[in-house]
Amino acid sequence: MKYTPLYEEHVKLGAKMVDFAGFNMPIQYTSIKDEVLAVRKNVGMFDVSHMGEVIVEGKDSTKFVDFLITNDFKNLKPGEIVYTAMCNENGGFVDDLLAYKISEEKAMLVINASNIEKDFSWMKKISESFDVTLENKSDEYVLIAVQGPNAQKTLQKITNVDLEQIGYYTFTEGNVLDIKAIISRTGYTGEDGFEIYTTDKDGIIKIWKKLLNLNVIPAGLGARDCLRLEASLLLYGNDMDETITPLEVGIKWAVKFEKDFMGKEALKRQLEEGTSRRLKGFKIIDKGIARHGYKVFKDGKEIGYVTSGTFSPTLNQAIGMALIEKGYKSGEIIEIEIRNKLVKAEIVKMPFYRGSVKSKKKG
């Protein structure tokens, strides 16, 4: 079992700890509902040090990352970030990730905790035909996410960086307190917010404690999962895996067919032929919460399965996403098998909720 440097802080706060991707992580401190609403209405923070970081350096750094991922990396300026899929030869997700362009010859790839080893060996394999070096820095970097409509106002009190200048999906290097960090305007909640990366493991504890003093609410992985689902953000292992493609889960915008990338031929073929299934949002009409793997029916016929489901504290409603046969539209009624009982649900447009997240770049 791995522990983040903030483990003892979580225990002091009375967090309920669980094993997540080999890390002992806080699932909740007070209640998932309170933590979700704190992030939606004010500001909360998450220890997300379990995330993986791979540093790519070398002459072909930009060329390599651009081929590795489906989205455009080549045309990013240093200081910009892109959300993307990383696909196998069949167009299925190896992972989804954030690619940070530090310079033309250096990048940071932020990957899911459950996929660190798999992703790194996949990247190594692809990198053999490029002039690059790859380093798995996942154990060195620690990370706090500060999220919510008041994230900027709060974080500004402890950093020398003008946060107003950091546009959505951009980053800069600077100090938080006196700790050297990468600060990016990114998150996984649907709210405005920042992620603070540092290799200073004592420093991250100082930052955490200072934010607590500023009345930032600590939030666990339970709230994080609720928030991301309300914002219709995908979770690897639930909403996508190696057998599911970006086109099936509605992120065609993150696939750039005008360039070359791993999995392009398979995805191009799928684009031409059309997908046989699509990820759709639903809200439960009857009582019950749908969970990953539950079967979905229409008029007695099985049409797919639930990928993610939860009770949304923000909407006071059970919601979820399901991968179902194509052709079903918003407003249609489907049924989900919950504990051997068919429960009615309505297909709805996503996202379920739009928060304070900035979609326009500043400046």
From Swiss-Prot:
E.C. numbers: 2.1.2.10
Assembly, per entry: The glycine cleavage system is composed of four proteins: P, T, L and H.
Organism: Thermosipho melanesiensis (strain DSM 12029 / CIP 104789 / BI429)
Transmembrane annotation, as ranges: none
Family membership noted in the UniProt record: Belongs to the GcvT family.
This protein's record includes keyword Transferase: yes
Molecular-function GO term, any one: transaminase activity
GO CC terms of this entry: cytosol; glycine cleavage complex
Gene Ontology BP term (one): glycine decarboxylation via glycine cleavage system
Name of protein: Aminomethyltransferase
Function: The glycine cleavage system catalyzes the degradation of glycine.
Entries under PANTHER family matching the protein: AMINOMETHYLTRANSFERASE (PTHR43757), AMINOMETHYLTRANSFERASE, MITOCHONDRIAL (PTHR43757:SF2)
Keywords assigned: Aminotransferase, Transferase
Domain of life per record: Bacteria
Gene3D superfamilies in alphabetical order: Aminomethyltransferase beta-barrel domains, Aminomethyltransferase fragment, Probable tRNA modification gtpase trme, domain 1
InterPro entries: GCS_T, GCS_T_bac, GCST_C, GCV_T_N, GcvT/YgfZ/DmdA, GcvT/YgfZ_C, TrmE/GcvT_dom1
Catalysis: reaction(s): N(6)-[(R)-S(8)-aminomethyldihydrolipoyl]-L-lysyl-[protein] + (6S)-5,6,7,8-tetrahydrofolate = N(6)-[(R)-dihydrolipoyl]-L-lysyl-[protein] + (6R)-5,10-methylene-5,6,7,8-tetrahydrofolate + NH4(+)
Pfam families: GCV_T, GCV_T_C
HAMAP family: GcvT (MF_00259)
